[in-house]
């Protein structure tokens, strides 16, 4: 991906700035419409969506498993997305993002990307190995993502496991010790970012002490800011 300084305009208009705030989900696409009945995975960029990206200076996209069926196909899709962004008035490259945590949450096919056992198992190795496996797993994931043209990963998960009834975080957490979770999370951030991947730590303000899955309901975190 070219550097932003090399391609960007000196100043962006209000419309361009607004477009840069948007990150779109193109999980499915049907030429006849993209309503609830459309379940055709978008694996290549249609011209109509390419125009949306270029005409509205879209800042980023998020890829899901529907968009990533093979190595060659994903590389081609990433290239098509960046070509569309290069035709925008701002000339800014896209943030191409994904959820590839390295455990249960993985959007890349198992035969395309390296599978890991997840953060809880990394946390279990802390006493003997420190942050070693956190760094190494992030490095492997980062190298695979950059090879596919992806530059943002919604990871690591730094929620602290505090609720045994939590239906959505559980094994995605490094554990129940806040200090250990922070050390392992920082190690993964370093592993990702030193290999070209922008990280997005999650989940704010904390999903480790809830009994509701935020994908299906509204969790309540009953803690003070302190």
Kindly give the residue locations of the regions a language model identified:
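Short polybasic/polar patches that bind polyanions
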Residues: 10, 146, 193
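Metal-dependent enolase-superfamily TIM-barrel catalytic cores that perform enediolate-based chemistry
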Residues: 183-187, 191-195, 201
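Extracellular/periplasmic catalytic domains that process cell-envelope and extracellular macromolecules
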Residues: 14-18, 53-55, 88-91, 192-194
């Amino acid at each position: 991906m070219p550097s932003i300084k090399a391609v960007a305009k000196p100043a962006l208009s209000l419309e361009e700035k607004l477009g840069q705030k948007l990150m779109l989900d193109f999980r499915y696409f049907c030429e006849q419409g993209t309503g609830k009945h459309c379940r055709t995975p978008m694996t290549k960029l249609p011209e109509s969506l390419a125009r949306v990206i270029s005409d509205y200076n879209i800042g980023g996209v998020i890829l899901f498993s529907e968009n990533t069926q093979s190595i060659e196909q994903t590389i081609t899709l990433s290239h098509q997305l960046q070509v569309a962004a290069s035709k925008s008035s701002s000339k800014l490259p896209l943030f191409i993002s994904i959820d590839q945590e390295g455990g249960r949450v993985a959007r890349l096919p198992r035969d395309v990307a390296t599978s890991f056992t997840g953060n809880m198992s990394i946390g279990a190795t802390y006493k003997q190995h420190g942050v070693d496996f956190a760094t190494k797993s992030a490095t492997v994931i980062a190298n695979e993502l950059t090879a596919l043209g992806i530059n943002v990963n919604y990871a690591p998960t730094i929620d602290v496991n505090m609720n045994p009834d939590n239906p959505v975080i559980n094994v995605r957490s490094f554990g129940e010790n806040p200090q250990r979770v922070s050390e392992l999370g920082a190690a993964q951030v370093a592993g990702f970012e030193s290999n070209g991947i922008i990280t997005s730590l999650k989940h704010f303000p904390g999903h480790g002490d809830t009994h509701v899955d935020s994908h299906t309901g509204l969790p309540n975190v009953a803690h003070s800011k302190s």
